[in-house]
Amino acid sequence: MYAPGGAGLPGGRRRRSPGGSALPKQPERSLASALPGALSITALCTALAEPAWLHIHGGTCSRQELGVSDVLGYVHPDLLKDFCMNPQTVLLLRVIAAFCFLGILCSLSAFLLDVFGPKHPALKITRRYAFAHILTVLQCATVIGFSYWASELILAQQQQHKKYHGSQVYVTFAVSFYLVAGAGGASILATAANLLRHYPTEEEEQALELLSEMEENEPYPAEYEVINQFQPPPAYTP
């Protein structure tokens, strides 16, 4: 007997979704959080390379700007001799540099998770709840706190060693400080983009995976069913 096309297709083919389109899948990749993450990485790297972290005026220090690049590795003796900084300030600036490096690593890992969207459960939870972005925000806040502490120590040292008796001494933040603040703000935006995004439940994900496997097992293209409906029935045989 003749079986109508689509009801008993060879190989037990399963139907596609209406219109023959592929089943919708929930992508784990997120451009909305990857873009602020990239800005955060760029800002932190620039802050480390930029020599202008603190601006000094009115003291005996011959330098007008100080940064963490002055204390990475070799510290020039003139910085200590001219009372630009003391050993405690050097240590604080090195701690600031260490937290900047940690912030770059966390922000880079968050960026890679947002771009590639791995399906591993642990990595998926880490990305969805923006743990790496949150760590970047905390590290940027720590850098800002240590920068304020370092500025107070340098200000006190410059007030003790004024260039002239009536010199007005002040220490202000330079471009690198604001770059770190901007990196923290970008990480906050990336965190919000991940946390406010709607994700399917575990049951919905399992259903989507099952339907996707059924779709991949189809031995015939979607057009086969339409063509088969217009084929004439076979000749009658007694």
Swiss-Prot record:
Region entry Disordered, spans: 1-27
Residues that bear N-acetylmethionine: M1
Any Pfam family matching the protein: TMEM127
Additional comment: Consistent with the observation that mTORC1 signaling regulates cell growth and size in many species, TMEM127 knockdown cells are larger and proliferate at higher rates compared to control cell lines. In contrast, cell proliferation is reduced in cells overexpressing TMEM127.
Subcellular location: Cell membrane; Cytoplasm
Residues the record lists as Phosphoserine modifications: S17
Tissue occurrence: Widely expressed.
Family: Belongs to the TMEM127 family.
Function: Controls cell proliferation acting as a negative regulator of TOR signaling pathway mediated by mTORC1. May act as a tumor suppressor.
Alphabetically ordered keywords of this record: Acetylation, Cell membrane, Cytoplasm, Membrane, Phosphoprotein, Transmembrane, Transmembrane helix, Tumor suppressor
Disease: Pheochromocytoma: A catecholamine-producing tumor of chromaffin tissue of the adrenal medulla or sympathetic paraganglia. The cardinal symptom, reflecting the increased secretion of epinephrine and norepinephrine, is hypertension, which may be persistent or intermittent.
UniProt topology in membrane: Multi-pass membrane protein
Result of changing R94W: In PCC; localized diffusely within the cytoplasm
GO molecular function: small GTPase binding
Comp. bias intervals (Gly residues): 1-11
InterPro entries associated with the record: TMEM127, TMEM127_TM
Name of the protein this chain belongs to: Transmembrane protein 127
Membrane-spanning segments: 96-116, 130-150, 169-189
Record-level GO cellular component terms: cytoplasm; early endosome; membrane; plasma membrane
GO biological process terms, semicolon-separated: endosome organization; negative regulation of cell population proliferation; negative regulation of TOR signaling; regulation of TOR signaling
Keyword Nuclease: no
PANTHER family per record: TRANSMEMBRANE PROTEIN 127
Impact when changing C140Y: In PCC; localized diffusely within the cytoplasm
